[in-house]
């Protein structure tokens, strides 16, 4: 299995071998253009990472951890005097009720994470194993 993200298209693709299983519409950070460089920049990282863990008690329904920062990210941030940040996830919507959930659909609202709806994060939770590669493109 693998995940491929196209930030500019707001799409995430789930593959099994080379077979496309599903395409997801996604939301990104409030500052979506460019690679994440430091904590608080609200950017979604770009590059090759992996799913490195999961949180069943997420504030966003469920969440899958992305292995950001990698060594390159840490070196680049340190060279510029910054913390690279962390806690980049694929997650669902905030644990709110009713009409508030509609606010988060079809807009960028995260702090750099990749968001899908709650039904989709449940699908991904069951389909994607820890160690699955995720390639995040511009």
Locate each region found by the language model.
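N-terminal post-signal-peptidase region of extra-cytosolic proteins
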Residues: 1, 28-52, 71-76, 99, ...
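Intrinsically disordered, low-complexity
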Residues: 1-34, 138
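Short, basic and Ser/Thr-rich N-terminal targeting/leader segments
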Residues: 6-8, 45, 60
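Short, functionally important structural connectors and interaction interfaces within domains
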Residues: 16-18, 36, 41, 82, ...
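Well-ordered beta-strand positions in beta-sheet-rich domains
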Residues: 23-25, 48, 87, 133
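Exported/periplasmic cell-wall-interacting domains
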Residues: 53-138
